Amino acid sequence: MNIFISLAILIATTHCLTLLRDPVTQNGASKFEKSIGKYKYEEGYLKAPIDPFAFTNDLEFDLRYFLNIDHYETGGPILFYTGNEGSLEAFAENTGFMWDLAPELKAAVVFVEHRFYGKSQPFKNESYTDIRHLGYLSSQQALADFALSVQFFKNEKIKGAQKSAVIAFGGSYGGMLSAWFRIKYPHIVDGAIAASAPVFWFTDSNIPEDVYDFIVTRAFLDAGCNRKAIEKGWIALDELAKSDSGRQYLNVLYKLDPKSKLENKDDIGFLKQYIRESMEAMAMVNYPYPTSFLSSLPAWPVKEACKSASQPGKTQEESAEQLYKIVNLYYNYTGDKSTHCANAAKCDSAYGSLGDPLGWPFQTCTEMVMPLCGSGYPNDFFWKDCPFTSEKYAEFCMQTFSSIHYNKTLLRPLAGGLAFGATSLPSASNIVFSNGYLDPWSGGGYDHSDKVQGSVISVILKQGAHHYDLRGAHPQDTEEVKKVRAMETQAIKKWIKEKARNSWRYD
């Protein structure tokens, strides 16, 4: 979310099982200095129970964290990132707002990795090999890890932090976690910035299942793409794929890797999915300056892509070339790639840089069932693959996880809404929910308008893509995001003061 993989894409693709390396630990607390870009931190591990909710065993694992106390002063706040579906490095690099706040707030900066992602593997190399292991991968288990982590930092790791305020930060699925962290553990977390968090995107949340592609299409059309150009492109690909000469033309035009050459007319499906995935991902990271979160991209990449599709192509070849220019901008803007590997069963997806390709699919095959599909014209400019059904999705889950003894009863479409709330969060407090109008995941956000309800704030960034406000300050930032970050900063300061006032009261 956060950074999420489209469920429609998952239905059409499979991924290879990746076994991750064990973290190298020394006495259970391996640590060393690291830096990513301009951000510096200590990497370490703390011991966490594999099952914090049961009292049947004492099994533990090494949970990874990043810590920076360069600007921390005794009693200062702890800015706590709730790690989401990927290795921790990517989120530390792309959550500059926390790093920017640390000097002003005299704060410690903490990132804690989500269990089963990155180096936080409860069963080391066996974590993904059996449902008896992978079954411990869930949002509620991760939240318990975070709660334990706060106690570790306050009591053992950060000097004088026993009464420090804790402010949770997260984007996408991490934003959902930061909000739920505050809701589930209000005695531990004093406030949360939940950016681009689709907290109401569950089976029973009553959001349109095709809203993601509706927003993707809106973003591209608003940026200058011609709807007919895109739709003619799909038709052109289908027609060209029917002949040997047409497939050869597409193999050359798209510079397809030998692993993903078009060999028959049905192969066009994976090429179309490859293009669609790039467009859906590009809409998420449509920032006003060059970035490399999911892929190296120029400023306002959707606008740049639409320069190639401002008018319908006059021939099938021209229409196919328009889509090629869009997909090549996403996957190869730097020009470093000589070929495109488009078959997702054999190649990385648009989200490959996040790592752990099977972790999030497993969560969507158990607790995080999020209906998502395209319905075609007039909703979007993709092809129709709606309706989303649990039965159809269960087939994907069985295909992907049957080798580790998964069965269809583990797909629980109502689990997420039951655990956290499918349509409302009545116990929420001290949370800022920020969503971007340009971000497809805003369709399942807390609200679609600016609103204040008690101490819960909803804010919409009209020029905002996926958790834009969490990124660090940049010379090309919009004035809008500067104002939103200023508002969020004031909210955080208010929560810190409330914590100090309440701590004094009970001294």
UniProtKB/Swiss-Prot annotation:
Key words of the record: Glycoprotein, Hydrolase, Protease, Serine protease, Signal
Gene (name only): pcp-5
GO molecular function annotations of the record: dipeptidyl-peptidase activity; serine-type exopeptidase activity
Top-rank EC class of the record's enzyme: hydrolase
InterPro entries, per the entry: AB_hydrolase_fold, Peptidase_S28, Ser_carbopepase_S28_SKS
Pfam annotation, one family: Peptidase_S28
Entry annotated with the keyword Repressor: no
GO BP annotations, alphabetical order: proteolysis
Signal peptide: 1-16
UniProt KW Plastid keyword: no
Protein name: Prolyl carboxy peptidase like protein 5
Organism superkingdom: Eukaryota
Organism this protein belongs to: Caenorhabditis elegans
Catalytic residue list: 172, 439, 466
Protein family (similarity comment): Belongs to the peptidase S28 family.
EC number: 3.4.-.-
Residues of this chain annotated as glycosylated in UniProt: 125, 332, 407
